[in-house]
Amino acid sequence: MATRDLPHSVGDFCFGWVDQIRSEITLGKSQDQLIKEDVLEDDETVETKVEIKNLWPAFASGAGLFSDGYVNAGISTVLSCLKKIYGDEFTKSNAMNNIGSIGFVGTVVGQLSFGYISDNFDRKTGMLTANVMLIFFTLMCAVASWGTTVQGFFACLTVWRFFLGIAIGAEYPTSSVIASEFANQLPSGHRNRYFSWFTNAMIDFGFVVSSFVPLVLLWIFTPRHLRAVWRLSIGLGVIPPLILFFIRLKMDNSKSFKKMNMKRVNYSKYPWWLIIKFYWFRLTVVSLIWFIYDFSVYSFGTFNTIIIGEVIPNGTLYENWGWSVVFNLFYMPGAFLGAFIGDYLGPRLTLAIGVGAQGIIGIAMSACLKSLKKHVAGFVVVFGIFSTFGEFGPGNNTGLLASKTCASSIRGQYYGIAAAIGKIGAFVGTWVFPAIQKHYAYSEDLSLQVPFYVSSALCLFSAFLTIFFVPPVGQDAINKEDRLFKEYLEENGVDIRLLGDSGVVTQYQEDEDIGVISDEKDDTVKVQQKNV
């Protein structure tokens, strides 16, 4: 089982992915075909329509990521304002780097710790705790103050930014995981799109709003009152999670978590080694894809600066923030349309198409940088298409792969690890790319082109990993993986009667109490109780 995801021959490596991709494609299949191919849970009824009872919990859980996108992106507004307000006192201090870096650390801590909480305590409890933390620490960042010195204020903001990072990270292995499990209760052929809309599209929408709200506040308060602008920009981020908190109170855990959780398994008997052997390879591949995506995003963002510099060389704060709204809007078409395609072509092929196209366009933009600088309108259009493909492919589907390639028993930890490694990739990018730019400082063009070449090449490598090494991810991937995981644990001597909440009976537990006897004469199947 430790090698189940590895290619078993040269032919399997070269051509095995073709049949796997075909099995994920739903384009052209009728509703009856999708129902026939779908693997259902033991007591699950066939869903043929998207119903609010299943759609609403998926939305309520995933929509919390809007706040994550809003608050996380809103920190850039804070930094912009602090540069204007405090000048060299801020830019030449450690505070500028600390506020950004400490957020990464907090996010990783939140992703890993709440991944464990989500699996071993309760999905809903973890999500509500993350929600409360997000409300509280967002508010603390908005009102941050300590003593009467500027350095005291910087230190206070840094501390609260760390805890806000934990809250943001906590939403990933709780909200996203719950959204994937409720999306799994939707009709086959519709599951991937709703997960993508309620997770990645929510984050992207948060980016858009977080760039537009400061612009509106700037119109109201003018650049003379930037303290009010940045504090209100962050503070308004409290409202969405506050509303969601009361909606989430009425939610319940998903069916798959109730049946598959390992809360009743004693810690000393927890099958850690079996889990590692079963999932090590696919978790490594999914995490590496996420790492590359987040790592590359930093260098891709440098082209924003180039375009703004060419369009408005001496732009005002209004103009700079206005263009920020435009750049963030580029994400939305990719996130929306990619969600549809993810259902029709499957997440692996969709991700590979998106990240592959992004790599090719990125190489072309780098090679033609001098020409593009002279045609700013064309540069903006090409960069917009480039950004759209980023959300169309990896933006939508990295989280989807992380949530559907493992069993419900360990989904929070699995997702949390993959997301944390992705976030580490973003952090590494903030250090690697400036070093590359510094190395090529003698040439303005090379200092911009080389990081883009590196990131674009990694995008193509990511497409290769997705096609050849990620396991099949069909519409019924969650149910299939739950069954395979149960069988694997049972074969290795784990008492699977401990799976699930107390009182929740699975088909496997029923089979322990019911014997199945075949009558050889008429080939009929009779069921009788054991020990009778």
From Swiss-Prot:
Coiled-coil zones: none
Methyltransferase found in the keyword field: no
GO BP annotation list: carboxylic acid transport; glycerophosphodiester transmembrane transport
Pfam (any one): Sugar_tr
Residues spanning the membrane: 55-75, 98-118, 126-146, 150-170, 201-221, 229-249, 272-292, 321-341, 349-369, 375-395, 416-436, 450-470
Keywords: Cell membrane, Glycoprotein, Membrane, Transmembrane, Transmembrane helix, Transport, Virulence
InterPro entries hit by this protein: MFS_dom, MFS_sugar_transport-like, MFS_trans_sf
Mutant lacking the gene: phenotype: Triple deletion of GIT2, GIT3 and GIT4 impairs the uptake of glycerophosphocholine (GroPCho) and reduces virulence in a mouse model of blood stream infection.
UniProt KW Cell membrane keyword: yes
GO annotations of cellular component type: plasma membrane
Molecular-function GO terms, alphabetical: carboxylic acid transmembrane transporter activity; glycerophosphodiester transmembrane transporter activity
Membrane topology listed for this record: Multi-pass membrane protein
Localization of this protein: Cell membrane
Protein induction: Expression is positively regulated by the transcription factor PHO4.
Glycan-linked positions: N266, N314, N396
PANTHER family the UniProt entry points to: CARBOXYLIC ACID TRANSPORTER PROTEIN HOMOLOG (PTHR23508:SF10)
Function: Glycerophosphodiester transporter that mediates uptake of glycerophosphocholine (GroPCho) with GIT3. Does not possess detectable glycerophosphoinositol (GroPIns) transport activity. The expanded ability to utilize GroPIns and GroPCho results from the organism's pathogenic nature and its need to occupy a variety of environments within its host organism. This possibility is buttressed by the fact that GroPIns and GroPCho are present and abundant in human fluids.
Family, similarity comment: Belongs to the major facilitator superfamily. Sugar transporter (TC 2.A.1.1) family.
Protein name according to UniProt: Glycerophosphocholine permease GIT4
The species this protein was found in: Candida albicans (strain SC5314 / ATCC MYA-2876)
